[in-house]
């Protein structure tokens, strides 16, 4: 929006009326539990810290608790249909068949859990089959060169991919390869401002508590607010 662009420009130039613009444009509000109620489907909460009541870990736990869709557990972790995710560092190698390849599914790529299925329960080959909607369409994929398959598309035309994560590490894997027993993504209702660099969302909520307000530099704040499209 025009107001949002003006705010970005205001912050970038470090003008004196930044606080006035934040308050007048209804871009700021006192911190209370209402911040945890999603305003948009494509929304993220950005934090500077992991611990504490309004830290990343607690917010992710709370918001996943409020997701009433079906779930599956893997150790201490659990995953629910509808959970937003970010692919992590292991994704860069998890989905390729040759280290010389440029990964198509990579670290810091957005997605959402569409479905999952437990296969071979109780067997040495036990694994979870995940269906993940990613944030872009994939075309002309050579299935022999990737460790996933495109199984469909969302209403917006983005791809839904399917892959499997094994419970046990294969004896065929060596230490140089990413284990197919590592889940290549993390739950991401909330992420760090640093992690959000390069990402965009329709709605962004930035948590600034008294404990960390002095740590929010101009650069960090500008990075955070420019993640929002709307």
Predicted regions and their residues:
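Core RecA-like ATPase module of SF1/SF2 helicases and allied nucleic-acid translocases
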Residues: 5-230
């Amino acid at each position: 929006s025009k107001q949002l662009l003006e705010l970005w420009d205001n912050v970038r130039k470090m003008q004196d009326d930044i606080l006035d613009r934040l308050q007048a444009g209804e871009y700021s509000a006192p911190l209370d539990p209402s911040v945890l109620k999603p305003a948009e489907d494509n929304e993220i909460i950005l934090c500077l810290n992991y611990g504490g009541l309004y830290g990343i870990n607690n917010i992710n736990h709370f918001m996943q608790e409020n997701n009433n869709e079906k779930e599956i557990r893997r150790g201490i972790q659990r995953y629910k249909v509808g959970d937003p995710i970010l692919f992590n560092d292991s994704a860069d190698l998890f989905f390729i068949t040759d280290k010389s390849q440029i990964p198509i599914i990579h670290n810091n790529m957005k997605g959402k859990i569409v479905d999952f299925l437990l296969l071979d329960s109780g067997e040495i080959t036990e694994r979870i089959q995940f269906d993940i909607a990613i944030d872009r369409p994939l075309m002309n994929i050579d299935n022999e060169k990737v460790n996933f398959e495109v199984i469909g598309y969302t209403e917006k035309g983005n791809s839904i991919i399917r892959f499997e994560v094994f419970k046990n590490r294969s004896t065929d894997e060596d230490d140089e390869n990413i284990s197919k027993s590592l889940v290549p993504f993390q739950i991401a209702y909330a992420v760090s401002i640093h992690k959000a660099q390069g990402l965009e969302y329709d709605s962004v909520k930035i948590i600034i508590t008294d404990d960390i307000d002095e740590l929010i530099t101009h650069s960090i704040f500008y990075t955070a607010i420019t993640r929002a499209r709307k």
